[in-house]
A protein has these predicted regions:
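Conserved beta-strand/loop element in small beta-rich adapter and peptidoglycan-binding domains
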Residues: 1-2
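Boundary regions of SH3-family modules and the immediately adjacent low-complexity/disordered segments
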Residues: 7-46
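Aromatic-lined substrate-binding rim segments of carbohydrate-active enzymes
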Residues: 37, 85-114, 158-185
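Hydrophobic faces of well-ordered beta-strands that scaffold small-molecule active sites
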Residues: 48-52, 74-78, 107-113, 151-153, ...
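Catalytic domains of carbohydrate-active enzymes, especially glycoside hydrolases
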Residues: 59-86, 139-151
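Surface-exposed, active-site-proximal loop segments in enzymatic domains
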Residues: 85-92, 117-133, 162, 224-225
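Substrate-binding surface in catalytic domains of secreted glycosidases
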Residues: 86, 137, 160-279
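Substrate-binding cleft of extracellular glycoside hydrolase catalytic domains
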Residues: 100-151, 155-156, 178
Length: 280
């Protein structure tokens, strides 16, 4: 009872007489750490965006014809960039003339980059620091050369193992974008349990806009059904807004539907058709 068990800083345990133990000495430490404050490039008005499918440089020449009857849109996103190989190189269809014409019509231009090439692995590119940063550098260089207002990231069918690398890519790209006055947006599928690795909450901290791809509820190979039923879309919006501020969330809606047919052999087929054709 006259002894106290004590331990040294390096782990040795022993005993010392109580009378030789002084009162406890308490030191209060103040935290100097400050959480990082993020700033965002957002528009003063709601974003009304239209994606423009561009598959060749010649297609850029038809910008005026393509947009002559377009109303209500303030951002156009041409599909100009694609990751072409595992070194993070980018193929580009960008056109400064296209951007100039869009600006004359009062449109902002966000160049889209996809991961659709069969010659690259998204996991390989994004998990490799050199390849990932090469991708980021090329995107920003192309964007500045063409006079773009922003970059739209459309990386689809991401596996669970690439989730953390995708987020790191967005973090790094957002820094470069903001240093060069470029808006950064990212496309996401409607939230489901199997897409939780997209981590929309973390995305919402670093990108300017999170876009919900509110379509493909039913698709080729699935059961017959709506491309985007109202309850399904509403739930997707609700789940996204639980993680991302509403003012930086965009809902993308489909201007197409699917025509479902059953063959004589009983097989279910479907064909994507535009709204004009669907009305016929």
């Amino acid at each position: 009872e006259d002894w106290d068990q004590v331990a040294t800083d390096d782990g040795y345990i022993g005993y010392i007489q109580k009378k030789k133990v002084s009162a406890a000495d308490t030191t209060d430490y103040k935290r100097s750490f400050k959480a990082e404050a993020y700033s965002y490039f957002t528009m003063d008005e709601p974003v009304n965006l239209a994606w423009h499918q561009v598959t060749s440089t010649d297609a850029n020449n038809y910008f005026a014809d393509t947009t002559q009857n377009m109303t209500g849109v303030n951002v156009i996103s041409p599909t100009w960039f694609s990751v072409s190989d595992n070194d993070g190189n980018v193929s580009s269809l960008a056109s400064g003339e296209y951007v100039m014409q869009a600006h004359e019509k009062g449109l902002k231009v966000w160049g889209l980059v996809d991961n659709f090439s069969e010659n690259m692995s998204t996991t390989t590119v994004l998990s490799n620091t050199a390849a990932r940063q090469n991708l980021e550098n090329q995107l920003v260089t192309y964007a500045l050369k063409a006079g773009l207002d922003g970059i739209n990231v459309d990386f689809e069918s991401l596996s669970e193992d690439v989730g953390i690398h995708f987020l790191q890519f967005l973090r790094e790209l957002s820094i470069q974008c903001h240093e060069n006055n470029l808006v950064l947006s990212v496309d996401n599928p409607v939230p489901e349990d199997f897409t939780s690795h997209y981590d929309r909450a973390e995305q919402g901290k670093v990108v300017d806009y999170v876009i919900i791809m509110g379509y493909d509820e039913h698709y080729v190979g699935s059961d017959a059904g709506s491309v985007a039923s109202l309850p399904w879309v509403e739930q997707g919006v609700k789940d996204t807004l639980a993680e991302v501020p509403a003012k930086r969330t965009i809902l993308a809606i489909p201007f197409y539907t699917r025509l479902w047919k059953t063959t004589e052999g009983g097989a279910l087929t479907s064909e994507a058709i535009g709204m004009d054709q669907a009305q016929q």
